[in-house]
Amino acid sequence: MKSTLQELSLKEIIFQFRSGTLSSRDLVESAIQSHKEGLGAYRDFRRDAALEMASLADQAFRCGTDLGPLQGIPVSVKDLYGLSGTRTYAGSPKALPGAFEKEGPVISSLRCQHAVFMGKTHTVEFAFGGLGVNSHWGTPRNPWDANTHRVPGGSSCGAGVSLQEGSAWIALGSDTAGSVRVPACMTGCVGLKTSFGRWSLEGIFPLSPTLDTAGILTRTAEDALLGFCAIDPAYQGRQAELMKEVESLEPASICISTGDTNLWDGCEPGIAEIVEEALGELGRAGVRMVESTVSETEQAIELFRIGSVPGIELKEFLMSNLPSWIETADPVVGSRIKSSSSVDAGEYLRRLRVLKKLASDVQSHFETVDLIACPTLPISPPALAEVSAVEGYAPRNVASLRNTVVGNVLGLCGITLPVGLDASGMPVGLQLLGKHGSDAKLLSMACRIEKILGTSRQRLGIAPCFK
């Protein structure tokens, strides 16, 4: 069972901090008590450091200093981000050189706001995988199955678990093919992938400079909007403005395309049905639903299946900067790096040209619709035992990223909202993709949609591991 503090939304916490009815230290102590070692969310859970940061946030409040909406808020950090005072491993068995501890703009912004860093969450090695498997450190447990160890999604594999257990309200992640949205979906959370280039990647271990984006996982879409406004350079301090837009947004002003059948085909039992039911609810509430062909999605999926560019770029980076780390790579990661060896420079450049053209061509689709909707994942989180070996891992990894990678390849912003449970009792997500640069619009519409459909807690209930 969770404490009353754990039930508070980010908006409620922000208000209570400023009204003096709640302290950051009390909230952080609750977060520490909620942490469950057995779920394995963190590589480095920093109790003492978090309490010290909470005390600093409280002291600032007492002095009348308000540094931003995330002041005093518990935040978990994916172990790709440089964070002063703790080593960066990027999912590897040995720490990366000291240069990878340097903080980038995202972390620096949160530190300036006196956000509370709870620790480093686990990641798939080098962020190169969608299921969340890590043989070096152990794979975090998906809290939605109390009997079988199921994967939590990756590569930000500890992020969603940290939110569900209650040790954080914001989880920092990264998304190259779905690494924010996949774990958010598999653990019943909200996951925001920002538009490519919107947030600085400085201070974050690079998987693919061509496709990497920073993002956040939260418990609700409203929390995601507030987190976005705390981090995004163009929207810092504008959370009230966006919240007002949400309140005035009429359902009929939202137009959603259900996209091509390739985003719906092959879904495991209960997934497509749950998403269709959610879209039906939106339609009955007045949201305009249209069927339209988005041919670029099929081309994006095909490019991903033949390899796209992340594997090529990761191998080059490792060979140039961390050659000895290749030798100790997790088998499920090493096999993918190895498969990139056969791609020559000409093919790599061809793929870059295709990426650029697809991202350009798809923009015209958003002249008539606001969002593209589909299931976030076509599969249910598999049991860890089924994907521990390369043979079982490879096809499930491809399937887990099939729908999310479309957002990366086409240069879109995207979000996943939890909308129900599949036939196996595991979370199902509704993915919404928006035009490049329309992140604030996407979040506003996601919040309005959440008001119609309900939050994760309202639609999914409590994860079995916490009952």
Each model region followed by its residue ranges:
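An N-terminal boundary/leader segment
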Residues: M1-E52, R284-G286, Q458-K467
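Glycine-rich, small-residue loops and helix-cap segments
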Residues: G20, G72, K78, C112, ...
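Acyltransferase
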Residues: T21-E29, S55, P269-T293, M319-S324, ...
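Residue-level signal for inorganic ion chemistry
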Residues: A31, A50, A224, I256, ...
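Conserved acidic residues
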Residues: G40, W169, D370
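Short helix-loop capping/hinge segments that flank enzyme active sites or metal/cofactor-binding pockets
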Residues: L70-P93, P251-C255, S308-A359, P375, ...
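Short glycine/serine-rich loop/turn segments
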Residues: Q71-A214, G259-T261, C374-Y393
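Structural helix-boundary/capping segments
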Residues: E165, W169-T258, N262-W264, E276-A285, ...
